[in-house]
Design a protein with these regions (language model features):
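Catalytic nucleophile serine of serine hydrolases
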Residues: 26
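Catalytic histidine neighborhood in serine/cysteine hydrolases
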Residues: 131-146
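Active-site nucleophile elbow and catalytic-triad environment of alpha/beta-hydrolase enzymes
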Residues: 85-102
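Short beta-strand/loop motif that positions the catalytic acidic residue
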Residues: 106, 112-114
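Active-site loop/oxyanion-hole signature of alpha/beta-hydrolase fold enzymes
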Residues: 1-23, 157
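Catalytic histidine-centered segment of alpha/beta-hydrolase-like enzymes
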Residues: 143-152, 156
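Conserved alpha/beta-hydrolase "acid-adjacent" motif
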Residues: 119-124
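Flexible "cap/lid" loop of the alpha/beta hydrolase fold
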Residues: 30-38, 44-72
Length: 166
């Protein structure tokens, strides 16, 4: 995760953007939050869709595992070693002593959006929205986790509204 944050910052600097809206889906939503905490001066807002939130709660994991087979299959070519490394770096982030203080004092507006039919419980996103000073939370009804794939028109309007809304 630390490398991904550094990569985002390098891209921002290379293209000469002063501030930007950082949007992400799933792990990318959590990355957007981490990036905003580490580089608040560069982030106008965060849009996190169907993220996990910085937690390793057993009940969350059990619900995720129990419902996995019910989700639409999205065939994404990925490298298992990279996926494992990203998971490990996420765990390292959740164990940081200053994690919650950094979130609670981050002045970046953050919009957390849950997918209504996601097997991932949305309570961590609602908690984050309540924790960060300028947090908002909403649920998009009747869409699964990967609704960018299953409902692209809903995805497009969700992202557009989130980036242009209050």
């Amino acid at each position: 995760m630390e490398q991904a944050v550094a990569d985002l910052e390098a891209i921002r600097a290379a293209v000469g953007v002063v501030t930007w809206i950082v949007a992400g889906h799933s792990w990318g939503g959590d990355l957007a939050v981490r990036y905003a905490v580490d580089h608040p001066e560069a982030v106008a807002a965060v849009v996190s869709i169907a993220g996990r939130g910085p937690q390793r709660d057993q009940t969350w994991s059990e619900a995720y595992k129990a419902g996995r087979a019910t989700q639409p299959v999205v065939d994404i070519d990925h490298v298992p070693e990279v996926h494992a490394a990203l998971g490990d770096s996420f765990t390292e982030w959740t164990h940081r002593a200053d994690l919650w203080r950094g979130l609670a004092t981050c002045g970046v507006p953050m919009y957390f959006i849950a997918a209504g039919d996601d097997i991932r419980p949305s309570w961590p996103l609602a908690q984050l929205a309540a924790l960060v000073p300028h947090g908002r939370f909403a649920t998009v009804a009747d869409v699964p986790h990967d609704f960018w794939f299953t409902h692209p028109e809903v995805w497009t309007s969700t992202i557009t509204d989130a980036c242009t809304g209050p």
